[in-house]
Each structure stands twice: as C-alpha cells, then as structure tokens.
Regions:
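Conserved catalytic core of the tyrosine transesterase superfamily
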Residues: 1-2
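Residue-level marker of regulatory loop/turn positions in helix-turn-helix DNA-binding domains and
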Residues: 5, 103, 145
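Hydrophobic/aromatic ligand-binding patch that stacks against planar heteroaromatic rings
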Residues: 5, 15, 113
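The alpha-helix within a helix-turn-helix
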Residues: 6, 17, 125
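Conserved tyrosine-mediated DNA breakage-rejoining catalytic core shared by Y-recombinases
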Residues: 9, 14-61, 131-138
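Short, basic (Lys/Arg/His-rich) helix/loop patches that form interaction surfaces
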Residues: 9, 46, 54-74, 81-126, ...
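C-terminal secondary-structure termini that scaffold catalytic or DNA-interacting sites
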Residues: 38-40, 50-54, 58-66, 71-77, ...
C-alpha cells in the first residue's frame, strides 16, 4: 500500500514513509507535507486522487499507529531501504534493460507520462515539488497550482491502476504484492 501511494502521489520515499495523519485532509483530499521533510524546505500540497484516498481510508481503518500513516512493524518510520528491498524481492523491472525499478524511478515515470499526455510543464514540476531555478521567474510564480493539478493526478491514478488509454505500457505489479508492503 505504501508503494502504491508513493506512485500515485509521485512523492519521494522519505515524504511517504514519515507521513502522519495530521498532514492529511480526507475531506479536501489534500496531503500537506511539512517543510522540514521536503527537499526544498517548503511545505508541499499534494492533491489526492480517489484511489489515494481509498488507501488512506484503509490505513486509518487498520489503525496500526496513532500518528504514522505507514508505520513499520515496530511502530516507527520505515527504513529508507524497505521499498528498495520490496522492488528487488519482487524483481520489478526498470525501464532500463536488466535493472530493477527504484522508488525514485516512479517519479521519473510520472514526469514522462505527464509530458507525453500534454500536461503543462508547470503542473508536473509542481506535482514533483521541484523548485524554479530562475530567480526572476520564481519571484512571479508563487502558486502551487493545487486545483489545476487535481485532474492530472486523477488521470495519473487511472493510468497507474490500469484504467488509462495506454494500458499496453503499464508494467504490472500484482495488487497482492503491493498490499504486502
């Protein structure tokens, strides 16, 4: 479930592994990652697709931890190697021949998908929480485009779940394997 959520949100591993319930708004379907856990040290709002909300509701129902959304079996933030080990154990192929997929590689997949499907560069870059390197541009472009990104993230979720138009390009990871994580 943690891996599927990571893929659906195009988030970094550390952001998802340390995710807490107080960051989640299930009514407005937004996850706000605090600045201290973000690479760019700025809070990041993530619009949540219907499938991402389903995962969170399932986690809440399990009530494995009062604070952490995806706790380890010991009740702490999972190790940074947990997703890497899972992908290796499942032998999930990378787009690079002979290599195993990485958690971070799903962010690249999202970026490619967004470009190939005609989404504005700004939407994809904001979804990935990338900063604008041009200082002048950054000064004038302060919005996170949250509402504009909602449709893109819902379309990404349909693609990831195999309901998109381009299903022949979807690499299958069994739902059982995803749930085991």
């Amino acid at each position: 479930t943690m891996l599927e959520f990571l893929i659906l949100t195009a988030a970094r591993s550390g952001e998802v592994r340390a995710m807490t319930w107080d960051e989640v708004d299930l009514v407005d379907c937004v996850w706000t990652v605090p600045a201290e856990r973000m690479k760019a040290n700025a809070a990041h709002r993530v619009p949540l697709s219907g499938r991402a909300i389903e995962i969170l509701e399932g986690q809440k129902e399990l009530a494995k931890h009062p604070d952490l959304v995806f706790p380890s079996q010991g009740g702490s933030v999972p190790s940074d190697m947990i997703l890497t080990k899972f992908l290796r154990d499942q032998k999930v192929a990378s787009s690079e021949k002979g290599r195993v997929a990485t958690a971070h590689g799903f962010r690249s997949s999202f970026r490619d998908w967004a470009s190939e499907n005609g989404y504005a560069r700004d939407y994809a870059e904001r979804a990935l929480a990338h900063t604008v390197s041009n200082q002048t541009e950054a000064a004038y472009h302060r919005t996170d485009l949250l509402e504009q990104r909602r449709g893109m993230m819902e379309a990404w979720a349909r693609y990831v779940c195999g309901m998109g138009a381009d299903n022949d390009k979807v690499v299958s990871i069994s739902r059982e394997a995803l749930s085991a994580n």
